[in-house]
């Protein structure tokens, strides 16, 4: 039986996400990112194509490394202005039934107690269709604007993330017992306080004495996504991730990354297939190879090279304006997206990219490769990435929105279905059940969150803290 390919749309609540300048194309609706109807239409379109998920990226800083300023990013709308990624999800869920929503939130800038509530709320309102893309943030501008002197070091951010996840799992999985919520109108008991427990967490970075203030949602813990395959990021993913987003420039490099991740997952006590791995890809297609190539050339005529260099400046922490455009890029240690620079300095056949290469090959597609072709050519390549590269699926970025998604659904999905690679209907249940296959929609028993199930049963509860009251048995007055 052929392996089904997981299909996620990769988007962001901004104008220019991965392709700089193409918002100017006549068919682009990218400038409607503030319009709720844009997002609800997108969700319905994805469900028409039986996509697994809308993966929503986010940043809370700006791209101000290139030429020492955010001016170019603002001029080209390169991930700025950008809205909160949570805002449109409930509306999208209201017009769909199955497609999932992977929302990005950085652990560096929000307390776990608050973020746990936001994610549980969405999991309730979507009936269990939420994933959380865990990131540690990489833009120094974001750190400065929340009052930090500078961005935390790369590995320290992952140390924080380890403890952050521990707090989240305690809140989601442990603080409420399964039968804590009674909803008993006759007795007047909505929640049995003896079955709700403070987590009493006190660690190096976080202190959370209380209990989760949301009742358990359909999945309790949302599906955990993680982006980044640096050494420390891979270790974090091997323990926590159920879906992992990787950047790669070749099938060979993808095979190395996916094999390493699965080896680490196995070493962490999880199965090798417990993590679904998605790679970034932009597909430009039509009814033939020639039509797709013509479309690609048209899109390139709208691309903005300096806009892409502004994005790459933020992604790598390097001001490309200061580099010789024809000199190979050099690997370096900094606190930006390490895998971005690694993908450019350790590429296929040891190729090292130049600034001119980035301009020529990445103005469309951004952080990932671009695949141009008709249905058969594209399907062949997708199968090769899956069968030889070891990925489970793709985060599909757009060149022009919503046209790139519609073209993929109209041209590529039917071809993949002919080959037994794409679903033509959805399984019932939560996103986790659809994507991972767990029967009850809860995290697998080998996942670190599972250790907190029933962990507080028999321990201190909210009821234990209740003081005597003379009004405990009082009745409401009856109007005469």
UniProtKB/Swiss-Prot annotation:
Q: Where is this region: Disordered?
A: 423-480
- Reactions it catalyzes: dimethyl sulfide + NADH + O2 + H(+) = methanethiol + formaldehyde + NAD(+) + H2O
What class does this enzyme belong to in the EC scheme? oxidoreductase
State the activity regulation. Inhibited by umbelliferone, 8-anilinonaphthalenesulfonate, a range of metal-chelating agents, and Hg(2+), Cd(2+) and Pb(2+) ions.
Per the entry, which co-factors are needed?
A: FMN
UniProt GO MF annotations = dimethyl sulfide monooxygenase activity
Q: What is its EC number?
A: 1.14.13.131
Print the miscellaneous field.
DmoB has not been identified yet. Only a peptide from the protein encoded by a putative flavin reductase (AC E0XCR3) was obtained by mass spectrometry, which is insufficient for linking this gene to DmoB.
Please give the family membership noted in the entry.
Belongs to the NtaA/SnaA/DszA monooxygenase family.
- According to its UniProt entry, what is the function of this protein? Monooxygenase that mediates oxidation of dimethyl sulfide, the first step in dimethyl sulfide degradation pathway. Has much lower activity with diethyl sulfide and other short-chain alkyl methyl sulfides.
Protein name, UniProt field: Dimethyl-sulfide monooxygenase
- Which organism does this sequence originate in? Hyphomicrobium sulfonivorans
């Amino acid at each position: 039986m052929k392996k089904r390919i997981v299909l996620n749309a990769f988007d962001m609540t901004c104008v220019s996400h991965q392709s700089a300048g193409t918002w100017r194309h006549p068919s682009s609706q990218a400038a409607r990112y503030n319009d709720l109807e844009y997002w609800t239409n997108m969700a319905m379109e994805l469900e028409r194509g039986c996509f697994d998920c809308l993966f929503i990226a986010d940043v809370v800083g700006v791209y101000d490394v290139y030429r020492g300023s955010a001016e170019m990013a603002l001029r080209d709308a390169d991930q700025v202005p950008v809205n909160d990624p949570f805002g449109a999800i409930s509306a999208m869920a209201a017009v769909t039934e199955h497609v999932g929503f992977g929302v990005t939130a950085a652990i560096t800038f929000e307390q776990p107690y608050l973020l746990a509530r936001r994610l549980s709320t969405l999991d309730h309102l979507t009936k269990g269709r939420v994933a959380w893309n865990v990131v540690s943030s990489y833009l120094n501008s974001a750190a400065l604007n929340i009052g930090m002197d500078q961005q935390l070091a790369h590995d320290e951010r992952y140390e924080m993330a380890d403890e952050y996840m521990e707090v989240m799992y305690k809140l989601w999985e442990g603080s409420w017992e399964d039968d804590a919520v009674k909803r008993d109108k006759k007795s007047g008991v909505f929640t049995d306080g003896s079955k709700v427990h403070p987590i009493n967490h006190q660690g190096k970075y976080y202190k959370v004495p209380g209990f989760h203030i949301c009742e358990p949602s359909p999945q309790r813990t949302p599906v955990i996504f993680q982006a980044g395959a640096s050494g420390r990021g891979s270790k974090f993913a091997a323990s926590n991730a159920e879906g992992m987003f990787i950047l790669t420039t070749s099938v060979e490099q993808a095979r190395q990354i996916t094999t390493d991740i699965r080896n680490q997952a196995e070493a962490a006590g999880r199965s090798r297939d417990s993590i679904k791995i998605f790679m970034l890809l932009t597909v430009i297609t039509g009814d033939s190879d020639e039509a797709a190539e013509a479309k690609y050339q048209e899109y390139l005529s709208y691309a903005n090279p300096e806009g892409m260099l502004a994005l790459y400046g933020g992604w790598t922490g390097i001001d490309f304006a200061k580099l010789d455009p024809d000199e190979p890029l050099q690997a370096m240690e900094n606190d930006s997206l390490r895998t971005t620079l690694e993908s450019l300095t350790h590429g296929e056949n040891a190729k090292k990219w130049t600034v001119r290469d980035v301009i020529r090959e990445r103005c469309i597609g951004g952080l990932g490769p671009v695949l141009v072709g008709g249905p058969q050519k594209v399907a062949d390549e997708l199968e090769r990435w899956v069968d030889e590269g070891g990925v489970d699926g793709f985060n599909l970025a757009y060149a022009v929105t919503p046209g790139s998604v519609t073209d993929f659904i109209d041209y590529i999905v039917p071809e993949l279905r002919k080959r037994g690679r794409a679903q033509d209907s959805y399984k019932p249940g939560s996103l986790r059940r659809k994507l991972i296959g767990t029967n009850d929609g809860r995290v697998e028993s080998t996942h670190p969150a599972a250790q907190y199930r029933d962990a507080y049963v028999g321990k201190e509860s909210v009821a234990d803290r209740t003081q005597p009251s003379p009004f405990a048995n009082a009745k409401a007055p009856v109007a005469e």
